[in-house]
Amino acid sequence: MSSVRLPSVDRLLRSAAAAPLHQRYGREALLATLRDLLDELREPARRGALAEIELSEAVLAGRAGERLAAQHASRVRRVFNLTGTVLHTNLGRALLPDEAIEAITLAARYPLNLEFDLASGKRGDRDDLTAGLIRELTGAEAVTVVNNNAAAVLLALNSLGARKEGIISRGELIEIGGAFRIPDIMARAGVRLHEVGTTNRTHARDYEAAIGPRSGLLMRVHTSNYSVQGFTASVPTAQLAAIAHGHGLPLLEDLGSGTLVDLTRWGLPKEPTVQEALADGADIVTFSGDKLLGGPQAGLILGNRELIGRIKKNPLKRALRVDKLTLAALEAVLGLYRDPDRLAERLTTLRLLSRPAAEIRAQAERLAPALGEALGEGWEVAVVDALGMIGSGAQPVARLASAALCLRPRQPRRLRGRALRNLEEALRGLPLPVIGRLDDDALWLDLRQLDDEPAFLAQLPRLRSELS
């Protein structure tokens, strides 16, 4: 095949085929893409490895359009979380209710009284936007909000215990995802770790014996992401608070996930509430906004007015403060807690966590035939009982009764791994990626969080073509 001549960049820019790209992406982006494309084709064209049709204006504009679309596609993608883990850290944790989404939109679109007191006309405090509501719901004397619970713990420790000892049970030296370890956080906060007791048993006398002139605070951490069972002992908050206060020390309790309601009301496992921790005498309580609370990422610090005042004066507070969008969403979510009787229908996270297994199974029965048709005869599609998880370190042992579509290749066992990987990749490559979980030589799609059936079904023809 003889060599063919490449069209000039200028000719392609002025072509009718490139006009829509020029309008959509702008001249500079289109120019750079065309130059890169022609540079790649120059050598193959010289060798005669390309046909003239491959260098036509229409074909080249089409290839440039594909590249530009990929370059300009958002890295933030909506996905279907069918893993069975509701508060999946890697998939964004809590889903916000409509009220919070509307509040975020309003705060993003218009100026607002972020740090402006409308009554006095003077500078205000951004914490005031949510503090009154949080005090009303929890009974806390004072409140401040930072950007996540790790920041809340760091700030509270640094404000109350810097250059002093923090006394904590050895069984509560937790690690959560992202290398967050209590000993490391205490060190960063300038607090000297003084661990007491053993991994499985800590007694009141252990704390009493550890308190001395260098003591700055007692700390209690809710071990929400693991469970120690069997021969165990721990000191409840009320008793630990009495010990701390008897020596003039504050008690800091980190609840981790944190909740404002008794989850057993909706058939979920018991989690300690913020109100219980405060009523039992904890001086400062910290917890997350985007886990069981069902709100945006935030770290809430509640408790004693004088101690919260010290925390708010810490220079780190400004570095860790939240923005207007977070506060707008948080206020909207907290407002839903004023009506606990309707909370499960309005708070997205609680609605998903408490969704009945029978309802999920009925959904799976509806979807199974269509998915079986899309996958073809090489796959078995079965509706099975499943056990999901809350996620984000909340109740790691507890399971949520659910139902799933179990996709198993009809192939010899030695070939199933490749088939499953191909299917998993095809599902992730859909316009709305579908994320499931591999288990027992099958791909499981737990439907607890499948809210949008039409969008899921609309992708099945695309899935079939990808697999064929």
Swiss-Prot record:
UniProt keywords, alphabetically: Cytoplasm, Protein biosynthesis, Pyridoxal phosphate, Selenium, Transferase
InterPro entries registered for this protein in UniProt: PyrdxlP-dep_Trfase, PyrdxlP-dep_Trfase_major, SelA-like, SelA_trans, SelA_trans_N_dom
Modified residues (N6-(pyridoxal phosphate)lysine): 291
Catalytic EC class: transferase
An example Gene Ontology biological process: selenocysteine incorporation
Molecular functions (GO terms): L-seryl-tRNA(Sec) selenium transferase activity
Superkingdom of origin: Bacteria
Subcellular localization: Cytoplasm
Cofactor(s) this protein cannot do without: pyridoxal 5'-phosphate
One of the Pfam families matching this protein, by short name: Se-cys_synth_N
Keyword presence, Cytoplasm: yes
The EC number(s) this enzyme carries: 2.9.1.1
Reactions accelerated catalytically: L-seryl-tRNA(Sec) + selenophosphate + H(+) = L-selenocysteinyl-tRNA(Sec) + phosphate
Main location: cytoplasm
Database matches in SUPFAM superfamilies: PLP-dependent transferases
Annotated GO CC locations: cytoplasm
Pathway field: Aminoacyl-tRNA biosynthesis; selenocysteinyl-tRNA(Sec) biosynthesis; selenocysteinyl-tRNA(Sec) from L-seryl-tRNA(Sec) (bacterial route): step 1/1
Family from the record: Belongs to the SelA family.
Function: Converts seryl-tRNA(Sec) to selenocysteinyl-tRNA(Sec) required for selenoprotein biosynthesis.
Name of this protein: L-seryl-tRNA(Sec) selenium transferase
Organism name: Pseudomonas aeruginosa (strain LESB58)
The organism's taxonomic lineage, starting at the top: Bacteria, Pseudomonadati, Pseudomonadota, Gammaproteobacteria, Pseudomonadales
Gene that produces this protein: selA
